[in-house]
Amino acid sequence: LTRLAAHRPIRRQPLAGDPDVRSWAWNAQILFEAGEPAAANEILRRAELYPCEFMPMIQTQILAKYQDRLDADVAEKAETYVRDMLPRAASERIHPSMYNDNFGNMALYVLLVAGSRFGLPEYADLGRIRLEELCDQFRRCGTVMEYGSPTYSPINLYVLAEIANHAPDAEIREKALRCEERLWVEAVTHYHAESGRMAGPYSRAYYIDTVGHAHLAVQRGAELVAQVGEEGGLR
């Protein structure tokens, strides 16, 4: 972890009142897509990194998608952080059948994509094992623990789609697509057209989801489901 000292030290946990740097990094991706790499790099340069389940995937995505637009110091910061977080992604406590399976799926993305990118077969191979465990979860149960969740179903869909986009070989991409398709079936069967969102019962939800105010993730997922319905197919 000391390798990040030239940038910002990794804290064990954010402090109360700290900004949500996950949102900073998500916004940076939007800026890259909008053709504003200078602003995106400055956000990433200032974002303080700490151990969590979301940021390792976000930083891996940024390296996979925007490497040619990253300033050298920002790229080094991201790579160092992801390398340091790989053991966390490989922890036995993080796996496809855990209750917070969005954590397991984000770790799966990091293992597969970062492990391959950095030439670390011990992590890439573990990612393959974990992906097969996820496939087995679908074969045995038909869905994941966070089924029908207005917050986490869209996150799980997004992660699996990104594995299919950035995975190093065709077999991994095909397995990820099959898992993604099964989750789309889950989303469609919970979609309530009149309200434009997923309907209960929810496996995991927040108060905001129960009083008629959709999460941003819900809105994103509902819009995609609506498009799928109009086009008449899952893909």
Task: Cite the ranges covered by each PLM segment.
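Mature N-terminal, pre-catalytic/accessory segment of carbohydrate-active enzymes
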Residues: 1-18
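Aromatic-lined, polymer-binding surfaces characteristic
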Residues: 16-167
